[in-house]
Amino acid sequence: MLALAAAPLLVCSAATADDALPDANRILDRLEALELRQKALERELAERDARIRELERRARGREATAGRQLEELPVSPNEEPGTTGATRSAYALNAGPRTPPAVDSGSEPSSYGVFQPGGQGFKLVDTPQGDLNFSAWAYVRYLNQQDLDDSYVDAFGRERTIDQRNDFQLNKINLYFKGWLFDPAFRYNFYTWTSNANQGDPASVVIAGNLSYQFSPELDVGMGIGGLPGTRSLRGTFPFWNKVDNRTIADEFFRPSYTSGLWAAGTFENNLNYRVMIGNNLSQVGINADQLDDELNTISGALWWTPQGEYGPAGGYGDFEHHEEPVTTFGVHFTHSREDRQTQPGTEAIENAQLRLSDGTLLFQPGAFATDGQVNRATYRMMAVDGGYKHRGWSLEGEYYWRAMDNFSTVGDVPVNDLFDHGFQLQLGSMLLPRKLQAYAAGSKIFGEYGNPWDLAVGLNWYPNERRLFRVNTEMLYLNDSPVGYASVPFALGGNGMVLHTNVELMF
């Protein structure tokens, strides 16, 4: 009886087990499908992470490229303002492929007519085929040189008159039209550049530009008018200087200048940056093509490292940004050029990177050494090393220069076969009021074969709206036998004594 009673139960249990098997199989199938899908998602996430890392790497390179090309508002025709590869900051104007989107806090984004902060200017056009941006830089200067001696005597006993000045000048104006076309990696930069203190002189107004293409963060190639990167001030740091559009006399004395040529620049993931350029001569401003030789042997290069990954906008001077942690920069530069007296600009040329003796005498002028001889050709070689430190509004920055000139081609009696000079500059800055008021001191000295000139300046920068690109500057400058000087800078050739100048500088 019990067996008969249990039989139906066993039959039901067996049937239930048979029914459960398909369900278990379906669950296993679903688990396997979910496992496969999870693996696919993991692969997709890994690929996406790899793409993000690559985009971040490219973005770092683009910000680096921007500094080499787009934030340096040049003292003479060169490239426009940008952030150096070391900075990777928000100040980059056309950071690589495309100009950053316009910013307008008070309205919806627009494709044109919008002001872009940080020196980017106004976005005039923004289309899938390219964009166009307009920016400008200018400053007004009051200059008083009445405390200078009215004459000086050079190393050969020749007395020369100094034209003391006391005037106002709208000293320089730069107008920029820049952007990209067809391919975001292909960029153009066209500009007009004026030096109103030199009105009437050759090349007081220049219309020029350059073209560039970024193949990768490590390789950006350009051609046109550019600065030979022979010193830090020609490495894309302008206008982020303590001074307003003038260097120490040592930097001015040793440096190369601006010329037409071809360059390559790049930045690497270890925060190492480079720029190398081959050009026509040391300074092409005011020089026509017929005056150039056919050797094309002017070459200049710079290699610099920012261990912390950035050194402020454009890698410039001073710590306006108030770095909470210390940042540093280290660089080395070299320039070589075979110069002809016809390829050197005139004495009062706007950017007269002249080859001079340390008493200010032009190397190529007739009778330079108080003889009947003249140097017609010479080889210029210059090396510079620089370093900088910034922390909490303080900055200390220096540079040392070595320059050799030899292999002279002469006519008549020239008593020397070569020249060697060296020197240094130091700049100390402190933000007395964060983003409002900066004090600085800058000095330099040249150890030369025909004199040891030096200069010392102290100045104040006031930023009325707490923006670095608009400031009022006042500087007291003491000169001792200045070997350099021309109309657009505050120092006078041969100057001895005190100079006062006040500047109002604006860049947008």
Label every model-predicted segment.
Residues S107, H323-F508:
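Outer-membrane beta-barrel pore domains
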Residues A15-Y139, Q146-D149, N271, W305, ...:
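N-terminal periplasmic/intermembrane-space "pro-region" immediately following the signal or transit peptide
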Residues R26-D29, T298, V499:
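N-terminal amphipathic/basic helix or basic patch
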Residues G119-Q284, Q291-Y311, Y317-D340, F420, ...:
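Outer membrane beta-barrel
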Residues P22-N25, R165, A378:
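Residues at secondary-structure transition points
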Residues F115, R255-P256, A378-T379:
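A short catalytic or substrate-binding loop motif that flags glycine-/basic-rich loops and adjacent residues
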